[in-house]
Regions:
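Residue-level hotspots at or immediately adjacent to binding/recognition sites across diverse folds
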Residues: 4, 19, 50
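Cleaved targeting-peptide boundary
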Residues: 18-26
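Sec-dependent signal peptide recognition
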Residues: 1-7
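Compact alpha-helical subdomains of small soluble proteins
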Residues: 41, 45-100
Length: 100
């Protein structure tokens, strides 16, 4: 009985420590990508070009593509008008660290 309890606790603690919803990415990875995407916008790329670039990336977890697509939408949307390359990364890092 104790063995099953310990296995259950191990499974729960492993699940809590899992990287979801970021996949294998860290908040710094998210911030770095946001800055990269903002640099694309500043260089004159369109949202469609940025989304096409996402298709060429390799992902360790399906949720990573979903997250990066959401960042592209933010960067190329109304919020991105007021961001710099640096501030885009800072905003996304802060949002990630606070769980948003």
């Amino acid at each position: 009985m104790l063995r099953f309890l310990l296995l259950g606790l191990l499974a729960i603690s492993t699940g809590v420590q899992a990287a979801y919803p970021l996949g294998t990415m860290t908040c710094d990875d998210i911030a770095s990508f946001a800055s990269e995407a903002m640099s694309w916008r500043k260089e004159g790329q369109t949202r469609e070009q940025a989304l096409a670039a996402l298709e060429n990336r390799t992902y360790n977890d399906p949720v990573e593509k979903k997250n990066l697509t959401a960042i592209v939408d933010l960067v190329f949307g109304p919020y991105g008008r007021n961001w710099t390359v640096e501030s885009a990364g800072n905003v996304m890092r802060t949002d990630c660290m606070t769980g948003r």
